[in-house]
């Protein structure tokens, strides 16, 4: 799904509003995913998945850092996320559906924290962006 110039502007503006809260929102999105979609916990058997866990916060920071990198490389997501794609496809072997579940959880998290900025247009742009990130992360599964 191609991001239009308007989509790119919406994604950059929304992620700019996330700012210093990126790691916090990443962790909250993971917690939300684990609660809403319990089967996703199977990929984290060694984690303490309780609320506020340092491990969930740490992984949330990694998710946020990857998304921040992606926002900075909207015209070259495959290049920016190549190593992460290799990791998830070849080492971690994460079922691709889980990226959609995390994307949904992240959208809900962003909507709850940025209600005035989360317009239908921004929602659509972020959804397209996250779908593109998911596509890139699963591209090496084939």
From Swiss-Prot:
Source superkingdom: Eukaryota
Positions where Phosphothreonine occurs in the chain: 109, 135, 138
Q: In which tissues is it expressed?
A: Red blood cells.
Task: Identify the residues that bind O2.
Answer: 59
| A single cellular component GO annotation | hemoglobin complex
Output the Gene3D superfamilies linked to this UniProt entry: Globins
Modified sites of kind N6-succinyllysine: 8, 12, 17, 41
In terms of CDD domains, this protein maps to:
Hb-alpha-like (cd08927)
Q: Which residues carry this modification: Phosphoserine?
A: 4, 36, 50, 103, 125, 139
Record: residues binding heme b: 88
Q: Name one Pfam family in it.
A: Globin
Q: Which GO terms describe its biological process?
A: hydrogen peroxide catabolic process
Q: Which residues carry this modification: N6-acetyllysine?
A: 17
The answer to keyword Membrane applying to this record is no
**MF terms per GO, please?**
haptoglobin binding; heme binding; iron ion binding; organic acid binding; oxygen binding; oxygen carrier activity; peroxidase activity
| Xref: PANTHER family | HEMOGLOBIN FAMILY MEMBER, HEMOGLOBIN SUBUNIT ALPHA
State its role.
Involved in oxygen transport from the lung to the various peripheral tissues.
Return the similarity comment: Belongs to the globin family.
Q: How does it assemble?
A: Heterotetramer of two alpha chains and two beta chains.
This protein is called what? Hemoglobin subunit alpha
Query: Native species of this protein?
Result: Bos gaurus frontalis
The protein's gene is named HBA
């Amino acid at each position: 799904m191609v991001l239009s110039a308007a989509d790119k502007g919406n994604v950059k503006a929304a992620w700019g509003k996330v700012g210093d809260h990126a790691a916090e929102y990443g962790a909250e999105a993971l917690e939300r995913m684990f609660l809403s979609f319990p089967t996703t916990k199977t990929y984290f058997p060694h984690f303490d998945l309780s609320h506020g866990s340092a491990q969930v916060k740490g992984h949330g920071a990694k998710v946020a850092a990857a998304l921040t990198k992606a926002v900075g490389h909207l015209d070259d997501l495959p290049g920016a996320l190549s190593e992460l794609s290799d990791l998830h496809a070849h080492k971690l072997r994460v079922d691709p559906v889980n990226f959609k579940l995390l994307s949904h959880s992240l959208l809900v998290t962003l909507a709850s924290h940025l209600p005035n900025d989360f317009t239908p247009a921004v929602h659509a742009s972020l959804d397209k962006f996250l779908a593109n990130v998911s596509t890139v992360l699963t591209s090496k599964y084939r």
